Amino acid sequence: MKNCLIAHWYTPPYIIDLVDLAAGSKTDPALLKVMEDFYLKIGKKPVVFEKFISGYVANRLQAAMGLEINKLLDEGWATPSAIDDSVKYGLALRMALMGSLMKADFTGLDMMQRGMANRTYDPPIPKGNSSTLDELLESGRGGVMSGAGYFDYGGLSASELFKTRDIGLLRLKSE
């Protein structure tokens, strides 16, 4: 279909700028350009893919992190707070400024290659469910909408928590 493409937004879409655009094999290239220009005009950051990638890039990276995070929790190697602090005060701060590949350029690609060759651990292999997630869900801790997940949200309503998140994201975007 020449007038068909995928536009995939991220949550919350009224704050997060990334929009994945993926054309079908028969999509008119002019349509892809029109949509890219449209998203730029409304302040979004469209990322155009030559073809559909199952899960898109950001979701695939997030899924890989999720596997590692749940492995750390399942094995009792780290707490939710330690993991989130490692992300917020290290990984995410650098990635927000440079992304992943530019950060690698700053580290040095030779060092990156040596790190890959001499890795002291193996990334987790998807094996189904996480025992940590199973326990949380069985105890009614499904995340913000249920009042608790990895963290306890102290009786705050979901709308209060989403508002706090949104204000924080807007503050980060404005700096």
Residue ranges and their predicted role:
Residues 61-77:
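Flexible helical/loop "lid" subdomain adjacent to adenine-nucleotide binding pockets
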Residues 33, 40-51, 75, 80-175:
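NAD(P)-dependent Rossmann-like dehydrogenase/reductase catalytic/cofactor-binding core
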Residues 1-51, 55-59:
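Rossmann-fold dinucleotide-binding core
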Residues 59-61, 156-157:
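Short secondary-structure transition/capping segments
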Residues 17-18, 65-69, 111-118:
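A general alpha-helix detector
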